[in-house]
Amino acid sequence: MICLPVVEDSVEKAIKTAEKYLEIADIVEFRIDMLKEVSEEDIEKFAKYPCIITVRADWEGGYWKGNNEERLNLIKKAIECNAKFVDIELREEKNKELVKFRDEIGSKTKIIISYHDFEKTPSKEKLVEIVEKALSIGDIAKFATMANSKEDVLNILEVINKYPGKIIGIGMGEKGKLTRILGVYFGSILTFASYKGKSSAPGQVDIDTLKEIWRLMDLK
C-alpha cells in the first residue's frame, strides 16, 4: 500500500486533499496535529475515508502542543468511528488504555504503535526490542528512524523482513529512501510517499516516482 500524508491546516482543505490523493494512493494519513482547529465531529468525517488518523504529540516530533487528554479523546473518537487505523506513540503512557477501549467497544480500528528517532537508527537488536514491545500492545509496529549509513538501511530492512504484515519500517532522510522503496517488498504493510513536494517526513519519495520505480523493478 502507498499512503499519502495529508498535511493541511484546515479541515476543509484536508478533506479536499484526501479525496484527490485517494485517486492515486491506497490510503491517506490525516495529520490532525497540523490542523489549526479540529473537533470530534471532524474526526467522524475523516474516519469515513481509508485512512490513518494521527494526532502526533510535539514530544514525538509532531505539532500537537495542547492538552494530552483532548488529544487522546480525538483518538478515541476515531476508534469509535471505526477508522481503518489510528497511530499511537509507543511512549504514550495511555496507549494500552486506548487498545483496551477499542476492544471493549468492539471497534474494527487497527492500532499502530509508533516509535520515532529523528537523529539516528538504533542497533538491529534495539529495533527488534522496540517492535516486540509495540506488538505486545497494538496490532502493528511502526518505527521511523534516521538512516545515516548503509548499515542502518540493511538493519531496517532486516527487521521489516522479520515481521511481515505486522510492521511499518522506515528509514528517514536521503540515505533512508531505499527503505521507503523496498520496505513493502520486505513485509512493511505500507510506505509513505509525497505528492508534488508535500511531505510529512524527510526522505519521502514522490508517489509518481515511487510507482515508476516499482514498475521497473516489477514490485507491487
From Swiss-Prot:
UniProt xrefs under SUPFAM superfamilies: Aldolase
Gene3D superfamilies: Aldolase class I
Reaction(s) catalysed (UniProt annotation): 3-dehydroquinate = 3-dehydroshikimate + H2O
Entry-linked InterPro entries: 3-dehydroquinate_DH_AS (IPR018508), Aldolase_TIM (IPR013785), DHquinase_I (IPR001381), Type-I_3-dehydroquinase (IPR050146)
Gene Ontology MF annotations: 3-dehydroquinate dehydratase activity
SS bond partners: none
EC number assigned by the record: 4.2.1.10
Keywords assigned: Amino-acid biosynthesis, Aromatic amino acid biosynthesis, Lyase, Schiff base
GO BP terms, alphabetized: 3,4-dihydroxybenzoate biosynthetic process; amino acid biosynthetic process; aromatic amino acid family biosynthetic process; chorismate biosynthetic process
Residues reported in the UniProt entry to bind 3-dehydroquinate: 29-31, 56, 180, 200, 204
EC class: lyase
Active-site residues annotated for this sequence: 116 (proton donor/acceptor), 142 (schiff-base intermediate with substrate)
Quaternary state and interactors: Homodimer.
Family: Belongs to the type-I 3-dehydroquinase family.
Protein function: Involved in the third step of the chorismate pathway, which leads to the biosynthesis of aromatic amino acids. Catalyzes the cis-dehydration of 3-dehydroquinate (DHQ) and introduces the first double bond of the aromatic ring to yield 3-dehydroshikimate.
HAMAP family: AroD (MF_00214)
The protein's name in its UniProt record: 3-dehydroquinate dehydratase
